[in-house]
Amino acid sequence: AQFYQGSQLSFGKNRVQYNDFYWTFYRFKNYDVYNYVGGKELATYVAEQAQNEMDAMERTLDYRSSSRFQIVVFNKLSDLKQTNIGLELDDQTYNIGGMTKVIGNKVLIYFDGNHQHLQEQIRAGMARALLEQLFYGGNIRERLQASILLNLPQWYTQGLVTYLSKGWTSEDDNKLRDYIMTEKKPVLNKLIERDEIFAGQSLWHYIITTYGEASLSNLVYMTRINRSLESGFVFVLGVRLKQLSAD
């Protein structure tokens, strides 16, 4: 990787900042990794892991990255909260273990002292970055045009990112079992109302367990090509979403 000496890079001008960040970055084939004072070792780790995770995600999704993106690494959560990237996000969105933030072509990652959390953020960041490229294109014009034609629900996109970054654990099994036990008629729509992202994660787990790993990339591909959520399920799985939800 090439190392570039940075300057006072600006990502926006509307949020109060208590520290000035002097950014430098490492350049890789498909992305740049930004860091500031005290974050060189962390950025090096993130850069190495990001390449591994990107390779794995590209294989899983059967898709190769079509454009460059930036990974912005923060030494701690309080520094991330000062960033001007994505001002529409409030402090509640930066919860520990929450969804990695991907804004445009930027992936925001912070270190909370837990390397497992960091790894999940990197994995989720690579998944989200690739999925956004796959569904909506690499530049702003493509994304605006595609978003008009294809508006995917949170349970589909964020549920998939969660499944790709965390998989399915015994805790998830217990959580789903509790839901089934407490609902008289447990169906996906009710679970979506209760916990949309977990509902999506559960559905993706069911799809891959029932129809095989290749169904994931095939379903994503057909959804993109047909610009239709329903068509993707019918073409790949042979069932409508309503029927799948009932199962």
Where are these predicted regions, by residue range?
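Juxtacatalytic substrate-recognition/specificity segment
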Residues: Q2-S147, P153, S170-E171, L188-N189
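Acidic/His/Gly-enriched intrinsically disordered linker/tail segments
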Residues: D90-D247
